[in-house]
């Protein structure tokens, strides 16, 4: 067990060391530039497939996005939605703690696109005064934003198509 903890700590340290190389300077949709601030309406289950659904609505014009997500991702989003605080940090809590310890902040998340039934998102971080963009699954980005109180935005491209229920083992 101790070996796993040391290995996990090593992977985390390596990820932090490589963060500046992996992140890229901010580009793409900025807040207000063809984006819409979203509110999380909640989670539901698709009656046909039994797959969890994440429901979001644009604050400006009330357009909605529905995302099929996995049960683990739904749980990660449900925890902050219900105001729960687990006794020990979960993965998203840990990631935010690491960001904060390195004097960073999650500024916003942007759902950037939907292609071939898969939504795409970016985390926009303030890394010691430099704005950085990290690619993210939308469910992870939203779970982080809800914990941080960061805005959730969606680019116009995310509204273009409607998603289909994922096939067994499908993608978000």
How would you name each of these model-derived features?
Residues 9-19:
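Bacterial N-terminal signal peptides
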Residues 1-11:
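Bacterial N-terminal signal peptides that target proteins for export
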Residues 26-71, 75-142, 146-172:
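Divalent-cation
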Residues 22-23:
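Signal peptide cleavage region of secreted peptide precursors
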């Amino acid at each position: 067990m101790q070996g796993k903890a040391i290995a996990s700590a090593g992977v985390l340290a390596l990820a932090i060391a490589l963060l500046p190389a992996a992140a890229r300077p901010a580009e793409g949709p900025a807040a207000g530039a063809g984006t819409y601030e979203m509110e999380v309406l909640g989670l539901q289950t698709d009656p046909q497939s039994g797959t969890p659904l994440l429901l979001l609505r644009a604050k400006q014009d009330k357009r909605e996005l529905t995302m099929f997500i996995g049960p683990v991702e739904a749980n990660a989003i449900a925890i902050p939605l219900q105001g729960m605080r687990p006794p020990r940090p979960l993965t998203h809590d840990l990631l935010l703690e690491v960001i904060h310890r390195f004097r960073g902040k999650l500024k916003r998340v942007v759902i950037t696109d939907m292609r071939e039934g898969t939504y795409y998102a970016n985390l926009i971080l303030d890394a010691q005064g430099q704005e950085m963009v990290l690619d993210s699954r939308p469910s992870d980005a939203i779970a982080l934003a809800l914990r941080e109180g960061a805005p959730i935005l969606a680019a116009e491209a995310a509204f273009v198509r409607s998603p289909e229920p994922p096939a067994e083992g499908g993608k978000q």
